Each structure stands twice: as C-alpha cells, then as structure tokens.
C-alpha cells in the first residue's frame, strides 16, 4: 500500500468513525454538537496516530481535517456519496 492509499484509508476511517458516532448522539444545539464532534475527532486522531505510526500527519493537517469533517457532516446530513466526494477532495 503506497502513501497515498494509506492517507486515503486514514481519512476514510476518520470520517466514517465520526459519522457513525454522530448518528448515535442525541439532537443538540449546533454549538454543543460542534464541541462534541471536536472531542470525538480528537479521540479518533489520537487512536490513529498512536497505533498506526505510518499515518502520523502534521497537526495542522489534522486540524484542517477536523474542520472539514464537521462542515461536511453538518451540511450534508450523512450522505455517503458526499462523504466519499469529501474524502477524495481532502486527499492529495
């Protein structure tokens, strides 16, 4: 698996994990929802970077992915095709 494929897999796992957790949450205000998503994303990123050294990415890139994941989830209601497009768009 080359680096591009590894990065694609990392992003896919990140977004799918966030999406899955988001579905399990109760309805909240946007602010509460965003704060919850931030904690979820921090946890998922921590798990990925601790257990998969090959996936260690620059912290700024991870923060950018957090923001993009939140935006996509809020704006597109968990649409799988949109999520797939987002993964392709984020990936280099």
Curated annotation (Swiss-Prot):
Looking up InterPro entries in the UniProt record yields:
Rotavirus_NSP6
Q: Which UniProt keywords apply?
A: Host cytoplasm, Host mitochondrion
GO-annotated cellular components: host cell mitochondrion
Domain of life per record: Viruses
Q: Where in the cell is it found?
A: Host cytoplasm; Host mitochondrion
Subunit text? Interacts with NSP2 and NSP5.
Q: Which family does it belong to?
A: Belongs to the rotavirus A NSP6 family.
**Record-given protein name:** Non-structural protein 6
Annotated source species: Rotavirus A (isolate RVA/Monkey/South Africa/SA11-H96/1958/G3P5B[2])
Name the lineage: Viruses, Riboviria, Orthornavirae, Duplornaviricota, Resentoviricetes
């Amino acid at each position: 698996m080359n680096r591009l494929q590894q990065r694609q897999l990392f992003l896919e796992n990140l977004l799918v994990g966030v999406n899955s957790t988001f579905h399990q949450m109760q309805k909240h205000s946007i602010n509460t929802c965003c704060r919850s998503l931030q904690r979820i994303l921090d946890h998922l990123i921590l798990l990925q970077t601790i257990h998969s050294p090959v996936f260690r990415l620059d912290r700024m890139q991870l923060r950018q992915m957090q923001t993009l994941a939140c935006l996509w989830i809020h704006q597109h209601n968990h649409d799988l095709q949109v999520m797939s497009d987002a993964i392709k768009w984020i990936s280099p």
